[in-house]
A protein has these predicted regions:
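Sec-dependent N-terminal signal peptides
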Residues: 10-18
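Bacterial N-terminal signal peptides that target proteins for export
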Residues: 2-11
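Carbohydrate-active catalytic/glycan-binding domains of CAZyme proteins
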Residues: 25-371
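C-terminal motif of bacterial Sec signal peptides marking the signal peptidase cleavage site
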Residues: 21-23
C-alpha cells in the first residue's frame, strides 16, 4: 500500500495525465522560465500498458492462477475526501472487488464486492492491499486493516470460490502486524507470509516487538544503522496461524552487509512479493519514497537475500505495489499507476511481461514508452 510524500507529490506533478486514445498528455510549467510560466507546455506521455479496468479505481494487484484462470485481488481505491498526508489517511478503502481473466489480454471480469470491511468484526478503518492463496479446497484471503485502536493487523477470510464472498475470522492472525501480506507456497508445500511496510504501514513502530503509538512516523531515524526489514512467518497447515516466530527478511549487498536506513534507493519500504525461478527465491519489493521496484535473490525462502538491482523504473504516481506470476510458461508483473485519474489515491492496475535473463537477472522494465 502506498503512502504519500513530498517527493511523490513532485513526481506526480510532473506526469499528471489527460488520457487521449492510447497515449496521454500532461501539462506543466517550463523549467527555468518563470517569466513565461503562465504558458503551459504540453507533452505526450505514452504508457507501456493500459489499465485492465476503468469502471472502478484499483491498486496493489495480487494475481494468481486458480483452476486455470487468472484471479486478481486488488485494493479498491475511493475518493473519501480526506486530505493527503504522509500517513496515508487518504487511502480509505472499504472493500475488495475481485477480478478475473481467462488469459493475458483477454476480457476482465469484475465479480463485484467479494469482501467488505463491515464484515470484519475487529476492523476499524483502511482495508489495504490483500493477497490470496488456495489449499485443500479452500481459498484464503489475507488482508491488512487497522483495528479499533488504529493499529494495522493482518486478518484472514475464507471461501470455496476464488471470487468470494469471503468470510473473515473473528480475530486477526495472532502475532501479525503492519501491512502488505504476500503469501508464497514453495514446491515442498510449505507456505510463508511476507509482510510489512514502513511510514503509514507502521512497521517502524514495532522495532521493540511491541507497538509504540508514539513511535516514528517514517523509519528508525538511525541513518547509518541497518534498515528496517520486511517480516516473514511460516504458516501452519491450517493457513490461518503462524508456525513459530516472525523473522526478518534480511537484504544484504554484494559484500554481505545489510542495507542501511539511509540507502533509500535500495532498502525495503513496502509491497513485497516472492517468486521462485530456476531454484532461486526472488524477493521483490518497493523502495517507496524513491519509487523503484527492486529484487534480491537467495537460495532459501527465509534469506538472507542478496540485492541485485532495480527491475522496474518509477511509474506515474507513488510506489509500485506489484505481484509476479507465471502464466502458461511466461512470467508477468501486475502493477499500478495513476493514468486514469492523475491522483495518487485513485489508481489503476496494469500488467506487462517480466523476463528473466540467462544469468538469472531480471530485465529492466520501463513503464513508459520512449520515443
Amino acid at each position: 500500500m502506498s503512502n504519500q510524500s513530498k517527493k511523490g507529490k513532485l513526481f506526480l506533478a510532473l506526469l499528471v495525465p489527460v488520457c487521449i486514445l492510447n497515449a496521454c498528455t500532461s501539462t506543466g510549467k517550463k523549467p527555468g522560465n518563470a517569466d513565461s510560466s503562465k504558458k503551459e507546455e504540453t507533452r505526450k506521455v505514452q504508457y507501456l500498458s493500459e489499465p485492465l479496468i476503468s469502471s472502478i479505481y484499483t491498486a496493489d494487484p495480487s494475481a494468481h492462477v486458480f483452476a486455470g484462470k487468472i484471479y486478481i485481488y486488488p485494493s479498491h481505491d475511493i475518493d473519501a475526501g480526506i486530505p493527503e498526508n504522509d500517513n496515508g489517511d487518504h487511502f480509505a478503502m472499504k472493500d475488495y472487488h475481485i477480478l478475473s481473466m481467462d488469459s493475458i489480454g483477454g476480457k476482465v471480469t469484475d465479480h463485484g464486492v467479494g469482501f467488505d470491511i463491515k464484515d470484519i468484526p475487529w476492523a476499524g478503518r483502511q482495508l489495504w492491499a490483500p493477497d490470496a492463496a488456495y489449499k485443500n479446497g479452500t481459498y484464503y484471503l489475507y488482508f491488512p486493516v487497522k483495528d479499533k485502536k488504529d493499529v494495522f493487523r493482518i486478518g484472514v477470510a475464507t471461501s470455496t470460490n476464488p471470487a468470494g464472498p469471503f468470510k473473515a475470522d473473528s480475530e486477526p492472525i495472532a502475532g501479525s502486524y503492519s501491512i502488505d501480506p504476500a503469501v508464497f507456497t514453495d514446491t515442498d508445500g510449505k507456505t510463508y507470509m511476507y509482510f510489512g511496510g514502513i511510514w503509514g504501514g507502521q512497521l517502524q513502530r514495532w522495532i521493540t516487538g511491541k507497538y509504540d503509538a508514539n513511535g516514528s512516523k517514517t523509519d528508525s531515524k538511525q541513518e547509518d544503522a541497518p534498515a528496517i526489514n520486511c517480516k516473514v512467518a511460516l504458516l501452519k497447515p491450517d493457513m490461518k496461524n503462524f508456525d513459530g516466530k516472525v523473522k526478518d527478511v534480511l537484504i544484504v549487498d554484494s559484500l554481505g552487509k545489510p542495507l542501511l536506513t539511509k540507502d533509500h534507493n535500495r532498502r525495503f519500504f513496502e509491497g513485497s512479493w516472492m517468486h521462485k525461478y530456476n531454484g532461486k527465491y526472488y524477493f521483490t519489493y518497493s523502495t517507496g519514497d524513491t519509487h523503484f521496484l527492486c529484487y534480491a535473490v537467495s537460495s532459501s525462502p527465509l534469506g538472507p537475500f542478496t540485492y541485485k538491482g532495480v527491475f522496474m523504473k518509477p511509474v506515474q504516481g507513488w510506489t509500485t505495489h506489484h505481484s509476479i506470476v507465471e502464466i502458461k510458461g511466461r512470467w508477468f508483473i501486475f502493477y499500478h499507476d495513476t493514468q486514469l485519474s492523475g491522483k495518487t489515491h485513485l489508481r489503476n492496475i496494469k500488467v506487462t511481461q517480466l523476463q528473466h535473463n540467462a544469468d538469472g537477472s531480471i530485465k529492466l522494465i520501463d513503464p513508459f514508452l520512449q520515443d
